Amino acid sequence: MKLVIAEKPSVAMSLAAVLGATERKDGYLEGSGYLVSWCVGHLLELAQPEAYKEQYAKWRYEDLPILPENWKYEVPKDKKTQLALLCRLMKDKRVDSVVCATDAGREGELIFRLVYEYAGCNKPMERLWISSMEDAAIREGFDHLRPGSDYDKLYDAAVCRAGADWLIGINATRLFSVLYGVTLNVGRVMSPTLALLVQRESDIESFISKPFYVPEITCGGFTASGEKMTERSEAEKIRMDCDHNSAFVRSVEKQVKTIQPPRLYDLTTLQRECNRIYGYTAQQTLDYVQSLYEKKLATYPRTDSQYLTKDMQATAASLILWLRDNMPFGKGCAGEPDIDRVTDDSKVTDHHAIIPTVEIARTDLTELPSGERDVLTLLAVRLLCATTQAHRFETVTAMLDCQGHTFTAKGKTILQSGWKEVERIHRMSIRQSETEHRENEDAALPVLKEGQTFETVSASLREGKTSPPKHYT
């Protein structure tokens, strides 16, 4: 009999349903040769300093640094019952092997291994490593369980990360708190991140906005701009020189440019995009996509890859076709899907990019919580964008001369909307303002030729102020 240990109850229930372990027991499920139980997050945590020496209970400068030779762990009071159950199940004579089915990542490995070692278990250990909670993916994963030893280095990395956090957090927090007489929390990741925020805030507060002036001429239905100036008098002189005088086109440069489709989402890029579009925090996005994963609607979220593996191409192709036919933004796609563009086995380590699963075709999205619906929709949009045509446009840069002064006019003509059409339809569906996407875009220019003359131009002065750095989002 195999003992399967998941990271949380909801995942255990999904695994048990596929495995046929349907008989409910106190803290686990049983059936078809399986016992399926769960952790509740971390059941063991690194002990506080006083667990090593009683004198460390008091924060004193002379005790620093605190450097344990061997790590000690403690069990949170609210998790003792579940830990005791798992220890008992591991020692159950019916169990001949244990399957680590915690999240397929560094922290999931740590959660399971600490329990396995705490229980003193020496039964064979296997690893379930899947990127989707779909039934088919679960079956495939259990058909190809991997030796637990394959992930020893992943466990070592998790222990190192936890230890580094403890050493820096405990010692630096105590040091600065003692020196300054007030509790100052210091963390390995938190403190440098906070330093970036403080520096940016300082830059914003100390920023002194300065005015600038740009002489412009309007001729033939378009506007050309001169050099940005800090002295109004200089800009005004140019305006007066040019107003109601003639101008001619000195040069016209045309260039066709291509913007390739974006890559699929890894967790970081998904969090960044959800913050930009919806204002969700990184934690909110992670919570939403984790819930989608557990509902079998999205693949594993904690990934740093933006590519798929070759064995996913057939599934991805059918999913893309369904999205094109059934989602409003799907009509923005053109041409055959280019799945090869998002496929690269060499760029996938533990998990592939985050995409929807085929379960989306059997789900009423209106029944999902709004945050989950937003994230799932964004995953679908990105999958279509990444596999449709490139965005192509022609830029035109015209240099004009008016009374010896140089002016520049820029324009852009869309040749092929490509993936940006999918994005545009999605933006309209969520009523996102088009202004923020078009404010930096150039309108199309009329046809211009070198030497072309405009007999009378209208000159004006555009005023503005320099802007401070933006806050981080």
Predicted regions and their residues:
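Intrinsically disordered, low-complexity regulatory segments
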Residues: M1-A162, W166, H437, D442-A444, ...
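An acidic- and aromatic-residue-enriched active-site/binding cleft used to recognize and process polar
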Residues: P9-S10, C39-G41, D103-E109, I130-M133, ...
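Hydrophobic (often cysteine-bearing) scaffold residues that line and stabilize catalytic clefts
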Residues: V11, E107-I111, D156, C160, ...
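Active-site phosphate-binding and catalytic loops of NTP-dependent enzymes
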Residues: E23-G27, G148-K153, R174-V178, S202-F207, ...
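Long, highly charged, low-complexity internal segments
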Residues: L35, L43-K77, R88, G181-Q290, ...
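Amphipathic alpha-helical segments of the small helical/lid subdomains adjacent to P-loop NTPase cores
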Residues: A157-G187
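Extended, well-ordered alpha-helical scaffold/bundle regions in very large, multi-domain proteins
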Residues: Y280-V348
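Acidic, turn-prone loop/beta-hairpin segments
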Residues: P337-E367
